[in-house]
Regions:
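Short, glycine-/small-residue-rich phosphate/pyrophosphate-handling segment
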Residues: 1-26, 137-161
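Glycine-rich phosphate/diphosphate-binding loop of Rossmann-like nucleotide-binding domains
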Residues: 2-80
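Glycine-rich phosphate/nucleotide-binding loop
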Residues: 67-161
Length: 161
């Protein structure tokens, strides 16, 4: 679950704000409680490699950490964690959801681990929106080569709600 979506990497750090991080954590928590009926264990990645900040770029300490600290009494949230290790099996099994700072920080590992067996849930809307976890692949249109697993998982998820 990324804080920012489809942005060039050079623009990401300017879009990482305390407000956006807090909103995303709260929305994810509310979604789990409403639709899945339990309090999720949420991990948040840092922005910089290994969550190390140099003096000029200090997003992990100045922006991300204070938000997590402010929510810890209300929401089961921890971090920031290095994005290169949070998706390792022993780390990710400790959490129900991992919130990252940008699209590829989260989606690249998810698609590598789960391939087509993942779904996209758009949260924060007044209705439930679920789609297959892949973008439109126009090169596959009409060739009968697409994999339907993600569509099937999306329908199964909706059927349980």
């Amino acid at each position: 679950c990324p804080i920012t979506t489809h942005l060039p990497l050079k623009l990401v750090s300017k879009q990482i704000t305390k407000k956006k991080i807090k909103e995303k954590i709260v929305i994810v928590n509310d979604f789990y409680r409403k639709y899945l009926r339990y309090k999720p264990r949420i991990a948040v990645t840092g922005l910089n490699p290994h969550c190390e900040s140099v003096l000029k770029f200090n997003e992990d300490k100045k922006i991300i950490s204070p938000v997590i600290k402010s929510l810890k009494n209300k929401i089961n949230v921890k971090g920031p964690f290095p994005a290169d290790t949070i998706f390792l099996k022993n780390n990710r099994k400790k959490f129900d959801v991992i919130i990252g700072m940008y699209h590829d920080q989260v989606l690249a590992p998810i698609k590598t681990i789960f391939e087509y067996d993942a779904i996209n849930i758009t949260i924060g809307l007044p209705f439930l929106r679920v789609t297959p976890d892949h973008g439109p692949n126009e090169k596959m249109i009409g060739k009968n080569i697409s994999n339907p697993i993600s569509l099937i998982r999306s329908l199964e998820f909706l059927d349980k709600r």
